[in-house]
Curated annotation (Swiss-Prot):
It catalyses: (4R,5S)-dethiobiotin + (sulfur carrier)-SH + 2 reduced [2Fe-2S]-[ferredoxin] + 2 S-adenosyl-L-methionine = (sulfur carrier)-H + biotin + 2 5'-deoxyadenosine + 2 L-methionine + 2 oxidized [2Fe-2S]-[ferredoxin]. It comes from the Bacteria. Residues 49-265 form the Radical SAM core domain. Homodimer. It holds the Pfam family BATS. This is Biotin synthase. PROSITE patterns: RADICAL_SAM. HAMAP family: BioB. [2Fe-2S] cluster binds at C108, C140, C200, R269.
Amino acid sequence: MIAEVQEKTISSSPSIISEEEALQILKGEVPLLPVVAKASEERFRHFGNRVRIHILDNIKNGYCPEDCGYCAQRKGGESGIQEYSLKSPEEIWEDAKKAKENGAYRFCMVTSGRGPTDKAVDKLAETISKINGELGMKVCLSAGILDGKKAKTLKDAGLDRYNHNLNTSESKYNEICSTHTFKDRLTTLEAAKEAEIGLCSGIIVGMGEELKDIVQVAFELKRLGVISIPVNFFIPIKGHAIQKSTLTPEFCVRVLSVFRLVNPDSEIRVGAGREGHLGFLQSMALYVANSLFAEGYLNVKGSEMEQTMNLIRDCNMVPEFTEGIPEGWEDYDSKFLYDEKNFPELYKHKK
């Protein structure tokens, strides 16, 4: 293994493009390949050929008082999801160990609800401290609205990142949620930043927004100094208030490129919808983004770890673990692709 990776906590590199240029890219006024080439140049400048794999742990599902139109756990939603209260520290610990064994760079705990109580924060802090101390694993928490006191408690426990997505622009926000505001989200991010927790915040593309909304989010995240940006592509499933999504793989790559060019030194993560919306352009996306999720999302299945590792190998890239890059990864051998499991027709006459 190489030495432990040292991460920045605040994005500091200036944007490569202006708002007007970002709009031109999204409108398709600039050919795709030159855009990807420029975005890829920045990706490799700051992250080399490394890819960070994140695994989500949905530690509380449902029972949410918020009415976010993009969420299957929303108040009044009829998604049929399995609802459960906050997992025990023992359950979360076992999930973290499994994520570590599977090669996750960061363990992301997600809980439903408006925000955690003081008691819940204390329990989460205890769990974070154990994962950090005994597994040496980086931890990200997404638990809703947070104030300064709770943020400090989590920071003192060793929390590496706090996730609170902007999801869309301020002008669009009241169309997707009425139980809290865009300002509430900004206040939470500012509280986490004040506590010196690295910020993780991104967008959900495909909820009926205009191109200018996407650009506004990209530059708002830059203003906040967000160092980790998940770019999600909306998946309309039962229970969502929003049911339409018209995205193409080519457009999704353009979106990822815009976020990279606006936030050159931020971790750009291909989030939910990677498999369905990017399709055969998933490999191209990795030349722009340097991070992705494996083993699924909150209430939607995704690529398993083996598929994700194969994608990384095919791009001649390497997975970045908490301790660094595993030895021997460069010894790429494609013969495993042609085993009986993947190509049974080649073996059907085998004696």
